């Protein structure tokens, strides 16, 4: 095992992170003085020691920011498995000082200090004495040690201190044994003297006991006579009491019968009330439904009326529209007929023009050779004029075509827009359709929610009726139990709580509202706190005064009015201001299983603790009142779980109680039921509100649905109107395209005619044809024909214009007819809505009739139940009168029974006292026969004489016998303890001797091992000399003298084996001999300083063999050596390095550098150290500079 690497940061002079890689062999660190060489060895010591506390000296102190933390990390080679618990070939140990804490990490895992110590000790590292780290001055210190000091040093390395500590512990135990033996002997002497005096006292005690037994017998017989007399008296009283009980039982039976009858009638009455309540609820429900239904009917009727009015108006409008449509259809027929006739005229005119043109052409061809020059120019001009007219007409037709094409484009664009709007309206109608479906689903959900709410309301009403029935039952019990004054107190407190001038937060309420009691202790608490339940608790005196002023004010208001029995206030309100209550000291109740403090059985508001403590002070719950006489002597008030009470003044009340439930139970039950009723009512009210909200939502849904349907219908009508527009637009497109085609045909005809005229001119020019000479050849005149053609064309134009006008009129008629059709189409949808409303109205009216029948049924049922209730109440009143009579009789009988019970209680007290005395008679003692014949006077005289004799023994020690037995037991225990101490004394001696032997054996074995290597290493360092270690021991004479000296100093009373206290090994000396003369020996003190340092180094190297360490750390080991010794030491270290030992050395000498395997140069800049690997030349330069500085100084 050796150190492979050291990494440190913030440690001493090494501020920045520094890494140093080491190898096996000799590693030399060289640097100037104060550069930080020794800090590397200090870092190794910091890791290998158990220092885990925060120390400021380890932190770097330099220029710049202060360093708050540091760490040192060492990587060990574990190839030889020194750290046997780790399988890794390298072990990384790291210590970190941070935030005033030290943390240890092994292979990056945090461990505790104890685990770390165990880890180091497992691989042989002694953390308390690191003798393989040799600092400056440590070699000189060892070389100057005496023989005893060397021995102690070896012991500390070996761990012999553990033996010394064990030896000291054993010696202290031995001293304790001696002191205990002395005390036991003293106790023996004291016990003997005490035993003699107790023997006399015990004899007097026996005589006293005889007389006391006789007195007990006399008391016993006297008590027997008294007990018989009291027993006879009690039997007489019990027989009278039994007679009275029988009478009361008879009366009680009559009372129970009447109660049973009353409870039956009350049950009937409650059932009737419940039926009335349920009928009333159903009636209210039907009334509310009827009102709602009527509202809906009115609403629907109004809607239907409005729709019918609108329908009538629209029907009248439709009639006019139908008339208009019929008229339009007639006009359309006429126009179509007219158009047909015009079309036929146009065709006939065009044929006539064509015929005339043909005739002209024929004439021109016939008269080719007969034209004169005079008419030629005239005819040409005419034809050219005709051509000009045709050109004018062609230009006009061209404009018309452009105009019609432009109009056609506009119509096409308009059709695109209309198609787009159709798509938009279709999407809108689909959207409105989906919205209508959603509204339908929503309305169905709302109807379902309404049905569920109505079902919950019916369930809630049944629960409310049950709660009301329970309230009636509990209220009856409440009226029986609670006084009328308390009821009036509750009323006045309600008025106080409603008063604004009194702060409500200062009023805590009644005592019964501020406590909570378990069922087990309810009867006991009722007995004690019954008269305090309706005490009003307030915070301070000011609030109490305001309440009193308010009550007085109310009284004055009532006195000013006429007397009203119902409003008169009977009760007296008790008010307790908490701040004015006197506070008592805390009282500790006795720790007894048979009692429970009553205040611990009550859970209460912490503010009323002092008030409760005043009421329940020294009040306890006991199992039975018979066992509470001892507590009455200590002024405790006792009460049992059944509510029987015995006060500290001796007053007792309780016994048989017919009430099954007390005030607390009934009051809280009534309170809970009222809260439940309130919750149920609020729940029903909430459900009704939900139903109203659902109805409003349904109305909104129906309104939105009708508006959405109207929108959808509007979309449908717009789609229809757009379709009509598209149809008319398409018709216009068709007509315009026809018109354009017609114009094109006309243009072609005109072009043809123009070409013909041009041909005529050419013919005239070529042949000198004169068309005007037709009369000469016997044909029609060309001019007259041309005139006719012109007239025909004018007529044709007129007919065509008329045709276009009629066509435009036809389009307008079609448009009007489509508009009327769309309006009639919309009214069909509105008729469907009216039918739906009529169906809803019919259903509502049927439902209204059903509700009216239910109303009549429930009203009749309520009247019948009220009649039955009056009969039941009259019978209950009769039963109450009989009950009062029976109760009076029972009260008289109870009064007589109480008197007899009081007499019996006195007799029973006397009987109990006698019974107690009888119980106190010692068991196992036979009754004396002579006292059986004595009467009461003889027994009392004998008792007097015995008591006089007992007075003589008034000072007798009654505990003498007990003390004698105790003393004998103590005496036997002392004997046992004496024997145990002797055996332990012997065992301790044996243990001390065993420890001494073990220590000596370990020392001798270590000495043999060290001596061998010391001689070997010394011979390598001093070639002409030999050395050995000598173990010094005492001889017998010296041992006895030492024994005597120790015994005189300690002044022991008896002889002790002093081998326990004295070590026979006194020291280790070093004997040196010369090879030339072996008889001549030297000690270490006779050597020079350098030689002694070499011997000390040799001894240090030998100590390595104790734990087989494989590394050493020397700080300037060769400082005090001359050149020869440094050479020899270097050779020795080189030899040990070859054997596997690692050396890390700081030095200023060149000799060690010759044999070193690695050189490390340390430099310091601005109080920060830096280390790096260097060469021998660099190291020599640093050493030479240091030597020069040393010579100069």
From Swiss-Prot:
SMART domains with a match to the protein in the record: SMC_hinge (SM00968)
Molecular functions per Gene Ontology: ATP binding; ATP hydrolysis activity; double-stranded DNA binding; minor groove of adenine-thymine-rich DNA binding
Positions of ATP binding: 31-38
Subcellular location: Nucleus
UniProt-listed InterPro entries: P-loop_NTPase, Rad50/SbcC_AAA, RecF/RecN/SMC_N, SMC, SMC3_ABC_euk, SMC_hinge, SMC_hinge_sf
Biological process, per Gene Ontology: cell division; chromosome organization; double-strand break repair; mitotic sister chromatid cohesion; mitotic sister chromatid segregation; regulation of DNA replication
Xref: Pfam families: AAA_23, SMC_hinge, SMC_N
UniProt keyword annotations, A-Z: Acetylation, ATP-binding, Cell cycle, Cell division, Coiled coil, Mitosis, Nucleotide-binding, Nucleus
Subunit-level organization: Component of the cohesin complex.
Protein name, UniProt field: Structural maintenance of chromosomes protein 3 homolog
Organism of provenance: Plasmodium falciparum (isolate 3D7)
């Amino acid at each position: 095992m050796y150190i492979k690497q050291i990494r440190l940061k913030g440690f001493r002079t090494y501020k920045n992170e520094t890494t140093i890689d080491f190898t096996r062999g000799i590693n030399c660190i060289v640097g100037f003085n104060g550069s930080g060489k020794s800090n590397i060895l200090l870092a190794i010591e910091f890791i290998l020691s158990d220092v885990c506390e925060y120390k400021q000296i380890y932190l770097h102190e330099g220029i710049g920011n202060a360093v708050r933390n540091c760490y040192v990390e060492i990587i060990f080679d574990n190839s030889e498995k020194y750290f046997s618990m780790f399988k890794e070939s390298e072990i990384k140990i790291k210590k970190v000082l941070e935030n005033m804490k030290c943390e240890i990490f092994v292979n990056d895992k945090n461990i505790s200090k104890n685990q770390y110590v165990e880890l180091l000790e497992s691989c042989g590292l002694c953390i308390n004495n690191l003798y393989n780290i040799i600092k400056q001055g440590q070699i000189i210190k060892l070389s100057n040690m005496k023989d005893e000091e060397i021995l102690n040093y070896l012991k500390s390395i070996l761990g012999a201190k553990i033996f010394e500590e064990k030896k000291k512990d054993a010696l202290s135990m031995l001293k304790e044994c001696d002191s205990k033996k002395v005390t036991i002997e003293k106790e023996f002497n004291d016990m003997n003297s005490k035993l003699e005096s107790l023997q006399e006292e015990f004899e007097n005690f026996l005589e006293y006991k005889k007389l006391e037994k006789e007195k007990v017998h006399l008391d016993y017989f006297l008590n027997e006579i008294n007990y018989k007399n009291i027993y006879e008296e009690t039997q007489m009283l019990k027989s009278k009491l039994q007679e009275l009980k029988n009478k009361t039982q008879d009366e009680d039976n009559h009372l129970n019968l009447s109660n049973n009858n009353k409870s039956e009638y009350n049950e009937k009455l409650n059932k009737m009330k419940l039926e009335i309540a349920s009928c009333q609820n159903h009636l209210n429900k039907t009334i509310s439904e009827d009102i709602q239904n009527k509202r809906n009917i009115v609403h629907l009727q109004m809607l239907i009326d409005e729709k019918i009015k609108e329908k009538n108006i629209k029907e009248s409008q439709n009639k006019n529209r139908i008339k208009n449509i019929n008229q339009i259809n007639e006009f359309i027929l006429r126009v179509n007929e007219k158009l047909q006739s015009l079309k036929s005229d146009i065709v006939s005119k065009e044929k006539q023009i064509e015929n005339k043109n043909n005739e002209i052409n024929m004439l021109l061809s016939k008269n080719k050779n007969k034209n004169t020059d005079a008419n030629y120019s005239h005819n040409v001009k005419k034809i050219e004029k005709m051509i000009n007219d045709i050109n004018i007409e062609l230009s006009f037709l061209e404009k018309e075509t452009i105009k019609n094409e432009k109009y056609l484009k506009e119509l096409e664009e308009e059709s695109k827009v209309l198609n787009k709007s159709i798509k938009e309206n279709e999407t809108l109608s689909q959207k409105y359709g989906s919205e209508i479906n959603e509204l339908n689903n929503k309305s169905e959900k709302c109807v379902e929610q309404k049905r569920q709410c109505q079902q919950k309301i019916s369930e809630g009403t049944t629960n409310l009726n049950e709660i009301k029935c329970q309230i009636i039952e509990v209220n009856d019990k409440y009226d029986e139990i609670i006084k009328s004054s308390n009821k009036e107190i509750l009323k006045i407190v309600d008025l106080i709580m409603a008063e604004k001038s009194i702060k409500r937060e200062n009023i805590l309420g009644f005592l019964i509202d501020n406590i909570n009691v378990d069922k087990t202790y309810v009867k006991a608490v009722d007995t004690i706190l019954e008269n305090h339940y309706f005490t009003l608790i307030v915070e301070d005196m000011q609030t109490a005064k305001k309440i009193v002023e308010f009550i007085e004010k109310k009284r004055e208001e009532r006195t000013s009015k006429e007397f009203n029995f119902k409003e008169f206030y009977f009760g007296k309100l008790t008010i307790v201001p908490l701040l004015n209550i006197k506070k008592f000291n805390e009282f500790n109740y006795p720790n007894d299983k048979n009692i429970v403090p009553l205040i611990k059985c009550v859970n209460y508001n912490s503010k009323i603790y002092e008030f409760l403590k005043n009421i329940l002070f020294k009040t306890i719950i006991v199992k039975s009142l018979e066992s509470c006489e001892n507590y009455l002597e200590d002024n405790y008030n006792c009460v049992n779980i059944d509510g029987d009470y015995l006060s500290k003044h001796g007053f007792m009340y309780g016994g048989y109680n017919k009430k099954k439930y007390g005030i607390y139970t009934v009051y809280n039950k009534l309170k809970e039921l009222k809260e439940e009723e309130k919750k149920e009512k609020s729940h029903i009210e909430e459900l009704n509100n939900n139903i109203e909200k659902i109805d409003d939502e349904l109305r909104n849904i129906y309104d939105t649905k009708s508006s959405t349907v109207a929108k959808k219908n509007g979309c449908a009508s717009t789609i229809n109107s757009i379709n009509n527009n598209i149809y008319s637009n398409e018709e216009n497109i068709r007509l315009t395209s026809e018109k354009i085609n017609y114009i094109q045909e006309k243009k072609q005809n005109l072009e043809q005619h123009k070409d013909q005229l041009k041909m005529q001119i050419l013919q005239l020019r070529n042949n000198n044809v004169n068309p005007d000479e037709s009369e000469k050849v016997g044909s029609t005149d060309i001019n007259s024909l041309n005139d006719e053609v012109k007239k025909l064309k004018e007529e044709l134009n007129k007919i065509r214009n008329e045709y276009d006008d009629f066509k435009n009129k036809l389009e307008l008629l079609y448009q009007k007819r489509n508009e009327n059709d769309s309006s009639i189409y919309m009214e069909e949808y509105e008729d469907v809505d009216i039918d739906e409303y009529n169906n809803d109205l019919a259903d509502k009216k049927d439902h209204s009739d059903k509700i009216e029948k239910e109303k009549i049924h429930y009203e009749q049922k309520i009247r019948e139940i009220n009649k039955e209730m009056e009969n039941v109440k009259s019978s209950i009143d009769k039963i109450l009168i009989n009950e009062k009579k029976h109760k009076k009789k029972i009260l008289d009988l109870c009064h007589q029974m109480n008197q007899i019970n009081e007499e019996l209680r006195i007799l029973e007290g006397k009987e109990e006292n006698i019974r107690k005395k009888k119980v106190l008679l010692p068991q196992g003692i036979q009754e004396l026969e002579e006292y059986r014949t004595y009467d009461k006077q003889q027994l009392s005289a004998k008792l007097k004489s015995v008591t006089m004799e007992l007075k003589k023994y008034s000072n007798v020690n009654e505990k003498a016998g007990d003390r004698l037995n105790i003393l004998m037991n103590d005496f036997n225990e002392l004997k046992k303890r004496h024997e145990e101490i002797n055996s332990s004394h012997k065992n301790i001696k044996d243990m001390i001797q065993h420890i001494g032997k073990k220590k000596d054996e370990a020392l001798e074995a270590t000495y043999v091992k060290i001596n061998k290597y010391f001689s070997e290493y010394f011979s390598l360092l001093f070639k002409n000399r030999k050395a050995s270690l000598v173990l010094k021991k005492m001889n017998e004479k010296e041992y006895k003298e030492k024994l005597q000296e120790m015994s005189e100093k300690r002044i022991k009373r008896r002889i002790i084996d002093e081998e326990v206290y004295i070590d026979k090994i006194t020291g280790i000396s070093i004997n040196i001999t010369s090879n030339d003369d072996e008889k001549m020996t030297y000690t270490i003190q006779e050597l020079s300083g350098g030689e002694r340092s070499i011997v000390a180094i040799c001894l240090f190297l030998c100590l390595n063999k104790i734990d087989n360490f494989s590394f050493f750390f020397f700080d300037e080991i060769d400082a005090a050596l001359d050149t020869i010794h440094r050479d020899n030491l270097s050779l020795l270290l080189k030899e040990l390095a070859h054997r596997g030992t690692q050396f890390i050395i700081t030095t200023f000498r060149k000799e060690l550098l010759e044999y070193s395997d690695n050189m490390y140069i340390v430099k310091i800049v601005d109080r920060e150290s830096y280390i790096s690997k260097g060469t021998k030349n660099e190291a020599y330069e640093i050493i030479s500079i240091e030597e020069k500085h040393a010579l100069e100084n």
